């Protein structure tokens, strides 16, 4: 299985980039990971921005990808539950598992329609920049749980 994480907009802060690089490198010890960003849309009506960003994200999706959206209204999982989800997909023959962090106004209906699952990291609201690090850390934590390593206690 290949892992891909997509998001909308450039990573603005250097310290966020360092965090992304750190956790992507750690994940790479367990599985191939690809990170990609779609250009964010500015200056249009909210629905138009969602649609344009959705189109850009759809173009970045590999064929046969199993799509997981991150949304505050999604299903909340514990770290062990996320680990089981990762293991089930890996062992069940999923070729590409793609996690997507949307833009400031969320996801287009066309992207939501393609989603296999929608999850939430928390009921709290975080910046889209911070969510990148939080998601990657949780994916790394999931792989350490799968492998019985002491990172998660």
Swiss-Prot record:
Key word S-adenosyl-L-methionine present: yes
Cited InterPro entries: Alpha/beta_knot_MTases, RlmH-like, tRNA_m1G_MTases_N
E.C. number(s) listed in UniProt: 2.1.1.177
An example Gene Ontology CC term for this record: cytoplasm
Pfam families: SPOUT_MTase (PF02590)
Keywords attached to this entry: Cytoplasm, Methyltransferase, rRNA processing, S-adenosyl-L-methionine, Transferase
Binding site for S-adenosyl-L-methionine: 70, 102, 121-126
Keyword Cell cycle belongs to the record: no
Functional summary from the UniProt entry: Specifically methylates the pseudouridine at position 1915 (m3Psi1915) in 23S rRNA.
Family statement drawn from the similarity comment of this UniProt entry: Belongs to the RNA methyltransferase RlmH family.
Complex and partners: Homodimer.
Annotated HAMAP family: 23SrRNA_methyltr_H
Official protein name in the record: Ribosomal RNA large subunit methyltransferase H
Organism: Geotalea daltonii (strain DSM 22248 / JCM 15807 / FRC-32)
Gene: rlmH
């Amino acid at each position: 299985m290949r892992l891909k994480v997509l998001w909308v907009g450039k990573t603005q802060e250097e310290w966020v980039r360092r965090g992304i690089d750190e956790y992507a490198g750690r994940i790479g010890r367990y599985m191939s990971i690809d990170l990609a960003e779609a250009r964010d849309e500015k200056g249009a009506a909210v629905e138009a921005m969602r649609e344009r960003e959705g189109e850009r994200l759809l173009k970045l999706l590999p064929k046969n990808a199993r799509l997981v959206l991150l949304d505050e209204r999604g299903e909340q999982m514990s770290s062990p539950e996320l680990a089981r989800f990762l293991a089930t997909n890996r062992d069940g023959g999923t070729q590409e598992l793609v996690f997507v962090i949307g833009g400031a106004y969320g996801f287009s209906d066309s992207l939501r329609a393609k989603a296999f699952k929608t999850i939430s990291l928390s009921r709290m609201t975080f910046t889209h920049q911070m969510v990148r690090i939080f998601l990657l850390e949780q994916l790394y934590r999931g792989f350490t749980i799968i492998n019985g390593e002491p990172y998660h206690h």
